[in-house]
Amino acid sequence: MSALSSENINGVYIPSALLIFGTFIVKKEFVPYAVALTAILAGLKLFTGGSKPRKVLNPTEFQEFVLKEKTDISHNVCIYRFALPRPADILGLPIGQHISLAATIEGQPKEVVRSYTPISSDNEAGYFDLLVKAYPQGNISKYLTTLKIGDTMKVRGPKGAMVYTPNMCRHIGMIAGGTGITPMLQIIKAVIRNRPRNGGNDTTKLDLIFANVNPDDILLKEELDKLAAEDPDFNIYYVLNNPPQGWTGGVGFVTPEMIKEHLPAPASDVKILLCGPPPMISAMKKATESLGYTKARPVSKLEDQVFCF
């Protein structure tokens, strides 16, 4: 925010001038104290940007954000926390949308850009978190692993066709694979945060099928299980390619039978969300169509019954 913005002129400079002028008229000897007080208050307001959170995302221009924390989740998965310019700032990302990360990668002819969905929300001011799995051929994911605390990352957004609004449908079924859980988690947390018991009005039912290869690949399982335990209208069904002994979830690939058993049946007030590796998404598009859901488009739109991130 500019120091000479109308908000600062009307909210800082004019009130400060009136306070000093009024003090001068009433009691001149108190003027230095009035000046000192207004300087402190004005400085605090200018530094924090006022009490209203400031949205920092720019959809047309990349901005650089400083890496402040790295938390290893596994040998190839990490949560990267980037600081926003001010403690009260928020990213300004609508629920369901994502951001673009850009970097100049050695050996690439031009700047590489990839999309990611933060696992944090605008309820958490001053930073945003990205859960990223590093792939051997992943340009941006590998680049992120080289960042040190204090380094910066170029970010632009928001982008995407999905903008979740409370009660946009009666029942949402989700199928996620690997790091495809990130947009699902964003929506799940938003729905539960806005439940009637929490002072909101969202009564949307949520069912999630979360597929992975090994037990250790189930990202954010503790957080997901906690959310499901707290919310009777949110259910999870885990699927593993290599299940451990005594496993009670699904085994192998997600099948039409699993979808039929664990997700809502096709209806006008039902939406199915898909996010995961391309081969999985291709298979899930065919599976949902075979079960009577509307055929997924190559590029999803908000109104689609089957939406692919």
Curated annotation (Swiss-Prot):
FAD binds at residues 145-160, 171-208. InterPro entries: CBR-like, Cbr1-like_FAD-bd_dom, FAD-bd_FR_type, Flavoprot_Pyr_Nucl_cyt_Rdtase, FNR_nucleotide-bd, OxRdtase_FAD/NAD-bd, Riboflavin_synthase-like_b-brl. GO terms for cellular component: endoplasmic reticulum; mitochondrial outer membrane. Its EC number is 1.6.2.2. Its main location: mitochondrion. Gene3D superfamilies: Nucleotide-binding domain of ferredoxin-NADP reductase (FNR) module (3.40.50.80), Translation factors (2.40.30.10). Pfam families: FAD_binding_6, NAD_binding_1. One of its GO terms (molecular function) is cytochrome-b5 reductase activity, acting on NAD(P)H. Its cofactor is FAD. It is an enzyme of class 1 (oxidoreductase). The keyword Transferase applies. It is a single-pass membrane protein. Residues 60-165 form the FAD-binding FR-type domain. The chain crosses the membrane at residues 30-50. It catalyses: 2 Fe(III)-[cytochrome b5] + NADH = 2 Fe(II)-[cytochrome b5] + NAD(+) + H(+); 2 Fe(3+)-[Dph3] + NADH = 2 Fe(2+)-[Dph3] + NAD(+) + H(+). Keywords: FAD, Flavoprotein, Membrane, Mitochondrion, Mitochondrion outer membrane, NAD, Oxidoreductase, Transferase, Transmembrane, Transmembrane helix. It is found in: Mitochondrion outer membrane. Pathway: Protein modification; peptidyl-diphthamide biosynthesis. One of its GO terms (biological process) is protein histidyl modification to diphthamide. Monomer. Component of the 2-(3-amino-3-carboxypropyl)histidine synthase complex composed of dph1, dph2, dph3 and a NADH-dependent reductase, predominantly cbr1. NADH-dependent reductase for dph3 and cytochrome b5. Required for the first step of diphthamide biosynthesis, a post-translational modification of histidine which occurs in elongation factor 2. Dph1 and dph2 transfer a 3-amino-3-carboxypropyl (ACP) group from S-adenosyl-L-methionine (SAM) to a histidine residue, the reaction is assisted by a reduction system comprising dph3 and a NADH-dependent reductase, predominantly cbr1. By reducing dph3, also involved in the formation of the tRNA wobble base modification mcm5s 2U (5-methoxycarbonylmethyl-2-thiouridine), mediated by the elongator complex. PANTHER family: NADH-CYTOCHROME B5 REDUCTASE (PTHR19370), NADH-CYTOCHROME B5 REDUCTASE-LIKE (PTHR19370:SF184). Belongs to the flavoprotein pyridine nucleotide cytochrome reductase family. This is NADH-cytochrome b5 reductase 1. It comes from Neosartorya fischeri (strain ATCC 1020 / DSM 3700 / CBS 544.65 / FGSC A1164 / JCM 1740 / NRRL 181 / WB 181) (Aspergillus fischerianus). The lineage of its organism: Eukaryota, Fungi, Dikarya, Ascomycota, Pezizomycotina. The gene is cbr1.
